[in-house]
């Protein structure tokens, strides 16, 4: 379960997946992003798994409001505190590799209140 949480932490920061207002549950986010875990814990030498990009695109499409994105960010940052081994350099490149554009930096230090 901790590997799934690692993926959720990074990628929800990436796409601002909606967890508030009943739009998407934490379980749905975790399942959508689980295919990204091995990539984010590796060297980045291989291609991003197709299932990872599918999850990122799906969550990005579901993120409709600023409050929902901010709530997701806070949830993910909280979970990230106990997870090791994620390459945040790889995480920051995932949106572009999956054809998703986001207007903020992917980082554990991201200010969730500034996510739009």
From Swiss-Prot:
GO terms for molecular function: lipid binding. CDD domains: nsLTP1. One of its GO terms (biological process) is lipid transport. InterPro entries: Bifun_inhib/LTP/seed_sf, Bifunc_inhib/LTP/seed_store, Plant_nsLTP. It comes from the Eukaryota. Keywords: Disulfide bond, Lipid-binding, Signal, Transport. PROSITE patterns: PLANT_LTP (PS00597). It holds the Pfam family Tryp_alpha_amyl. Residues 1-22 form the signal peptide. Disulfide bonds join 36-52, 53-98, 73-112. PANTHER family: NON-SPECIFIC LIPID-TRANSFER PROTEIN 2-RELATED. Plant non-specific lipid-transfer proteins transfer phospholipids as well as galactolipids across membranes. May play a role in wax or cutin deposition in the cell walls of expanding epidermal cells and certain secretory tissues. Belongs to the plant LTP family. This is Non-specific lipid-transfer protein. It comes from Gossypium hirsutum.
